[in-house]
Amino acid sequence: MNLRPGLNVGAWRLRNYTTWNYNHANNDNNNPTTQQWNTIYTYAQRNIAPLRALLTLGDGNSPADIFDSTSFRGVQLATDDDMLPESLKGYAPVVRGIARSNAQVIIRQNGYIIYQSYVSPGAFEIKDMYSTGGSGDLNVTIKESDGSEQHLIVPYASLPVLQREGAIKYSLTSAQYRSYNSSVEKNYFSQATGIYGLPWGATIYSGGQFSSSYQSLALGVGKNFGDFGAISVDATQAWSKPKEMDKSTGRSWRIRYSKNLVNTGTNFSIAGYRYSTSGFYTLNEIFDTYQDTSFYPLTERKKNRAELIVNQNLGDSAGSLSLSLINEQYWNTDRRMSSLGLSYSNSWDSISYSLNYSYNRNSIPSSRFSNEHHSEVTRTSGRIYNNDQILSFNVSLPLDRWLSNTYATYSVNSSKKGNTTHTAGLNGTLLEDNNLSWGVQETYGTKGQGNGASVNTDWKAPYGEVTAGYSYDKYGNTLNYGVQGGVLIHEDGITVGQTLGETSILVKAPGARNVGVNNQTGVKTDWRGYALVPYASPYRKNTISLTTETLPDDVDLVLTSQTTVPTRGAVARVNYKANVGQRVLMTLLHNGSISVPFGATVNVNGGEQAAIVGDNGQVYLSGLADKGILFVKWGNSSDKQCTVRYVLSKINSSKQSNVVLTSSDCN
């Protein structure tokens, strides 16, 4: 069981994640019944808008942009990029120029217009251009008022560490080390990092980590070289004292590169290499040696790591190709880890398919290896190298011609060991809101390995989510089921819904029961008119629209769409006014048979909202109670005002499309 309770008080967000595990006794294996509670994290957090940062008190993780991320229990202040508008997020160079007159500035990248604006005569700077996430020079056209043009080229390429000119990103952490292993000592440490965007497409970054057993300093620089790509280089110097070992000093160098070859459609999304000397350790590695139970030796330390991720667009209708490669070597051991992934994907009409290949090579000391069934291994220098290769093909075919919202899937996987498995399945959604998803799969293995089948369902309901499934294979049968959801206690009562995300929205529409929310599968208002919308975007406009087709016959909404901008972790509320009652198209007559003039206003029971009389004295009124008073006015004099005292059940009327048609005298 997973519990994620939380409390919002003003700008503060208190969060907790606790699990409960229960294992029933197995008499065959003499295993006793056990139960255990585990707290995964507890923290209080709030945003500090002037600093564009989040303050965290309790459990958290340090940023991973300069040092490896470290789990902690303490205090951290770190910038939150989501607080920036979209036009200032990510990296984009500053575009500078001089306009001779009132001019239009047009910026193109790879032939596409990505920015347009108008500037006054004189020097100008454009700093609010959206980050494109790729590379390719920016072609700037300054179109003067007389029709003449200036043309500039601004180099552009990006890496995750790059910042806009003048932008700063920082973090300050002071805490205890928090390990998943309870026997590891809770050593204190402090960490500070900073990244600053310089002119000319450069970024400088630095950081430090400090504790009694470990200190490190890092310094790096990144540069946007335009057509030549983006490069960052950094170095880290570390002084460490592992438990029951001598002091050690080492350093680590890292280089990263990104480049988009527009003409060939090739994108090097990341290419990196890190080299560390034999005396270099990370903060996590040192802290993990300080265990209460026994000595934790550092026998395998990374010497170097190379990684490459390449994406290749093969052109129209030809699909795309991607390659990922990782290789690691270690000090004091001949261990080597290699991983290669190659995939091709494409679609034809509505059929999508892909071909994938993976190769993984890893090793363990031969003293740990005793499984006689692992035949595909290489024994070298006292180590066992396991070489695993898998080739797979996948295809997905929509069956809308015969079964709506249904897909047929097929995949085949073949490994170097000779095992081949075939899996065929059907997947789809049911119900009016497509909130019941289902899947059926059958698997066949050529050597009897992997033979089996499974059935799974997932129902997203207004009050939570229910999952259930059944599977079998040669090892046995498995039945799984689960229920998850969210409960919100607020000033108006209790609202139950689907699992709450980090940031959520409470819909308040009293009287509008069982009304759906657009683009929210299974989300509907409860019997009081309240609903929970999970997973809202913090610091962004979230538009919540109620589905008018699901409104009850006796309910109308004054507004059907609202926009809110919640902070991170908030539960924002959007209010809707629902008119509950009859929908009436009433013809108003005064002086016996004269229609009330066009444009007259009608107030129900003296309320603030007014309806307008149309042609032939007709007025549409929603949410009308069974009886009441209508105040009609088309002038200030008494002869241009009248009232209608109505009782819908006692007047002659007819009904058409859930609208009551009637006439009333206005006296």
PLM region descriptions:
Residues 1-104, 108-119, 143, 148-153, ...:
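Flexible, glycine-rich linker and terminal segments associated
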Residues 32-33, 131, 183:
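Short consensus segments that form the blades of beta-propeller domains
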Residues 101-102, 120-121, 133-136, 197, ...:
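Short, well-ordered loop/turn elements at secondary-structure boundaries
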Residues 119-136, 531-534:
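Short acidic/polar hinge/loop motifs at secondary-structure boundaries
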Residues 122-124, 211-214, 238, 328:
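Short acidic loop-to-helix transition motifs that present clustered carboxylates
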Residues 172-181, 186, 190-208, 216-219, ...:
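Core alpha-helical transmembrane segments of integral membrane proteins
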Residues 184-188, 196, 200, 212-215, ...:
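Conserved structured core elements
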